[in-house]
Amino acid sequence: MNILVSPYNKENHYFRSDSTLIRTVPEFYIPDFVESISATPILVFRVDLPGKVIDKKFANRYLGKFMYGVMLTPQMKESVHPDFQEYLKHSLDYSTIIPAIMTEKESLDKFLSEENPFTVEINGWERFRCTQNIPLDKVYEKFSRMTQFCSVRTGDYIAFE
């Protein structure tokens, strides 16, 4: 199982290993080699069918349920070798939080609102609030671009920052 990530307002994508996946984080241990952690909200879809070079008009067949989650990205201490920093940035254990319960993609356009926002709280402080969803056509377009370069398998996750 892979986690493919599409950064916000960028055309590229990268992978996070399945060892980064966790369903809930009641407490997060920050390793000694990490200076700080940033939290990035993500919209995540589960892949229902394997494929490669998937056209935008067929993307809805491949992407299944969705949910919002959070990616934790470490900033390393200067003592960590620069080459190792890039590796750890995308592979720190338990740093991709995707809830186990997901929702049908057909409800995406009505999922968030002012009354039902997605929020990220750190130590009780609200750090992020989202009340609007990414349109499905934009999701399908980015997914199609990703599959031009890599295959997707059933059970993979596609995360959009």
Where are the regions a protein language model picked out?
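Catalytic-core "active-site belt" of small-molecule-metabolizing enzymes
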Residues: 1-157
